[in-house]
Structure formats: C-alpha cells, structure tokens
Swiss-Prot record:
GO terms for molecular function: haptoglobin binding; heme binding; metal ion binding; organic acid binding; oxygen binding; oxygen carrier activity; peroxidase activity. Residues 1-141 form the Globin domain. One of its GO terms (cellular component) is hemoglobin complex. GO terms for biological process: hydrogen peroxide catabolic process. CDD domains: Hb-alpha-like. Pfam families: Globin (PF00042). It comes from the Eukaryota. This is Hemoglobin subunit alpha-D. It comes from Chelonoidis niger. InterPro entries: Globin, Globin-like_sf, Globin/Proto, Hemoglobin_a-typ, Hemoglobin_oxygen_transport. Keywords: Heme, Iron, Metal-binding, Oxygen transport, Transport. SUPFAM superfamilies: Globin-like. The gene is HBAD. Disulfide bonds: none annotated.
C-alpha cells in the first residue's frame, strides 16, 4: 500500500521522468529484451535493434501509461482498465512480463537519477510498479 510520502516521492521523481519520457521508456524496453530475451516474442514486427524508432515510440507509450497511473495514483484500476484488457484479451501477454519491465524501469531510474534515487524512492517506486503490475494482471483471473 502506498503511503502519502510514497505518493509524493513518486510524483516528485516523475517530473524528471517526463523530461526523458521516450529515452527512459526505450531504455527500459531494451534492457528487458536484453536480460529477458523471451519477451521479444511479443514484438515480432518490431525492429529490436538499439535506438529503433519502434522501440522509442513504444517506450514513450509505456511511460505515458505510467504517467497516467502517477496522475491517478489513487484509482489505478479504472485508469489502467483499457490497458489491462488490451494486454489480457488481445495481446495475451504473460503477466509475469509486467514485473520484468517494472524491474528494468527501476534500473533505468537508478542509473539516471543518481543520488536522487534514494532508498525511499526505490521502495516507493517498487510498491507503485508492483501495484501497476497487479492491476494490469487483474483481467487474467
């Protein structure tokens, strides 16, 4: 459960993320494809090379969806309902992949935020991304 302090930390850090939306999203996807190559199977039509426009575009969409979640942090289920439907019913993405991408996104945050990525920020983002992953996996039940 996110505390008010967690929410404030998430929103504060998100201001930095917004300045690098496409870069952070693309880097998180590239890290996921590198570390968890099985995730590439969901993107057979993508050019998966470093810096490809398709990865950059999708990375921006991913971070945009996370931004919606940040803005509506107290109503994640309603905010992410359509995205959950898409991934569960149309794309049929294994929900474990949400956790993998969440981990990669946290690595990107840590790599780019430096000292601003404190233990408190890490815990807040870990809880937030776990909540997002859980909501995205709701339709699989």
């Amino acid at each position: 459960m996110l505390t008010e302090d967690d929410k404030q930390l998430i929103q504060h850090v998100w201001e930095t993320v917004l300045e690098h939306q496409e870069d952070f999203g693309a880097e998180a996807l590239e890290r996921m494809f590198t570390v968890y190559p099985s995730t590439k199977t969901y993107f057979p039509h993508f050019d998966l090379h470093h810096g490809s426009e398709q990865i950059r575009h999708h990375g921006k969409k991913v971070v945009g969806a996370l931004g919606d979640a940040v803005r509506h942090i107290d109503d994640l289920s309603a905010t992410l309902s359509e995205l959950s439907n898409l991934h569960a019913y149309n794309l049929r993405v294994d929900p474990v992949n949400f956790k993998l991408l969440s981990h990669c996104f946290q690595v990107v945050l840590g790599a780019h935020l430096g000292r601003e990525y404190t233990p408190q920020v890490q815990v807040a983002y870990d809880k937030f991304l776990a909540a997002v992953s859980a909501v995205l996996a709701e339709k699989y039940r």
